[in-house]
Amino acid sequence: MSPERRPADIRRATEADMPAVCTIVNHYIETSTVNFRTEPQEPQEWTDDLVRLRERYPWLVAEVDGEVAGIAYAGPWKARNAYDWTAESTVYVSPRHQRTGLGSTLYTHLLKSLEAQGFKSVVAVIGLPNDPSVRMHEALGYAPRGMLRAAGFKHGNWHDVGFWQLDFSLPVPPRPVLPVTEI
């Protein structure tokens, strides 16, 4: 049985959200191969990343009944300037809110923001196997682009990493990507 769908408020993430975000992500670090980190993170790491990236990349949280229930955010795909129009996307939903559509809702808001900003494409990196994540990404329009075999070792096993990409239609040459605050 799926958990009950509750209305979610999707908004920009703030520094005050990062302890809750850290708790959500640490669950996946400790219990799964969704995240290839092997040690839990501290809230300050999340705060530092948010402050460093939020002007250029959207960071969104979903609040349900006053609690942070998930996060979707983007960051740079690679550090070279030619990649400026490609972002990497990530989404995490608290275990209590899985299978409620919240991940797709968060991702839809994130993708609308990235497209409005002028990004050309978005890459998702998925630790495999992870059928629910693959299904969600493909339902949102991502297409598989490749795989690295046995790229990460976690929980006593080697795991593949898959790459999915969503392309937006943009002119050539592209215009500069807009800051998050200008969309």
Swiss-Prot record:
Residues given in the record as acetyl-CoA binding sites: V91, Y92, V93, R99, T100, G101, L102, G103, S104, N130
First-level EC class: transferase
Protein name according to UniProt: Phosphinothricin N-acetyltransferase
Protein's organism: Streptomyces hygroscopicus
Keyword field contains Acyltransferase: yes
Catalytic activity: phosphinothricin + acetyl-CoA = N-acetylphosphinothricin + CoA + H(+)
Superkingdom classification of source: Bacteria
Biotech and industrial use: Introduced by genetic manipulation and expressed in glufosinate-tolerant maize by Dekalb Genetics.
EC number annotated for this UniProt entry: 2.3.1.183
Recorded GO MF terms: phosphinothricin N-acetyltransferase activity
Source taxonomy: Bacteria, Bacillati, Actinomycetota, Actinomycetes, Kitasatosporales
Swiss-Prot/TrEMBL keywords: Acyltransferase, Antibiotic resistance, Genetically modified food, Herbicide resistance, Transferase
